[in-house]
Structure formats: structure tokens, C-alpha cells
């Protein structure tokens, strides 16, 4: 019988495969959330390097946020990663939500990144 962690890993791998297949070589906006913080990075899988990154642990955001684990933090991280990606010359990405549902903090980050100038 599969454990919860195995199922989460299978879901993440299935989504990553679809992104590679349909992404057309575009960089991906990858999101990771923990119980206390949220992280986002724009990754160029062809070159194997990170183009832009932001998290709720960044000094600029840490001072503004009450906690790194709520939707307000996700919105701030989404705007910051979009700003940094646009500055790096990236505006078209694919959204990699990992094994997380498109709901709550993940949705808030995605919508803020769209408002910040990223298209996906």
C-alpha cells in the first residue's frame, strides 16, 4: 500500500512530466511551501540554473510580514519573484505547483506573479 508521501511524490512527478512535455522549453515557476514559509523560483531546466528566486525569508519581506505562512506572504513572494524574473528578462513561464493543490497560498502566489508581469 502506498503511503501519503509516495502518493505526493507520484503526483509531483506526473505534473513535472506534463510540464516538460507541454512547456515548450519555457522556464518554470516552481513553488515550495512549508508550515512556516513559502518559496518560489524561476528555473531554466535546459541550462540547469535558477534565473530568479524569492521567499518569505528575504530580508525585504521579513520586515513587512507578520508571518511567512499565510496568503499575504504568498502574495508578497509572488510579486517579488515576478519582479526579479522580469528584471532577468523572463516573462513567459510554466507554473509548477508541485504536489500542492491550486488553492490558498499557491493560488495567491500564482495570481500575484501574474499581476507582477509573468505570463502562464
Swiss-Prot record:
One of its GO terms (molecular function) is 5S rRNA binding. Pfam families: Ribosomal_L18p. GO terms for cellular component: cytosolic large ribosomal subunit. Keywords: Ribonucleoprotein, Ribosomal protein, RNA-binding, rRNA-binding. It comes from the Bacteria. Gene3D superfamilies: 3.30.420.100. InterPro entries: Ribosomal_uL18_bac-type, Ribosomal_uL18_bac/euk. The keyword Membrane does not apply. Disulfide bonds: none annotated. GO terms for biological process: translation. The keyword Ribonucleoprotein applies. Part of the 50S ribosomal subunit; part of the 5S rRNA/L5/L18/L25 subcomplex. Contacts the 5S and 23S rRNAs. This is one of the proteins that bind and probably mediate the attachment of the 5S RNA into the large ribosomal subunit, where it forms part of the central protuberance. Belongs to the universal ribosomal protein uL18 family. This is Large ribosomal subunit protein uL18. It comes from Gluconacetobacter diazotrophicus (strain ATCC 49037 / DSM 5601 / CCUG 37298 / CIP 103539 / LMG 7603 / PAl5).
Amino acid at each position: 500500500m502506498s503511503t501519503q508521501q509516495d502518493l505526493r511524490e507520484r503526483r509531483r512527478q506526473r505534473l513535472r512530466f506534463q510540464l516538460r512535455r507541454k512547456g515548450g522549453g519555457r522556464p518554470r515557476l516552481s513553488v515550495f511551501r512549508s508550515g512556516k514559509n513559502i518559496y518560489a523560483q524561476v528555473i531554466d531546466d535546459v541550462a540547469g540554473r535558477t534565473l530568479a528566486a524569492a521567499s518569505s525569508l528575504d530580508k525585504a519581506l521579513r520586515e513587512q510580514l507578520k508571518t511567512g505562512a499565510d496568503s499575504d506572504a504568498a502574495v508578497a513572494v509572488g510579486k517579488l519573484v515576478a519582479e526579479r524574473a522580469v528584471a532577468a528578462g523572463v516573462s513567459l513561464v510554466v507554473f509548477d505547483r508541485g504536489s500542492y493543490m491550486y488553492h490558498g497560498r499557491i493560488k495567491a502566489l500564482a495570481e500575484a506573479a501574474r499581476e507582477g508581469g509573468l505570463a502562464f
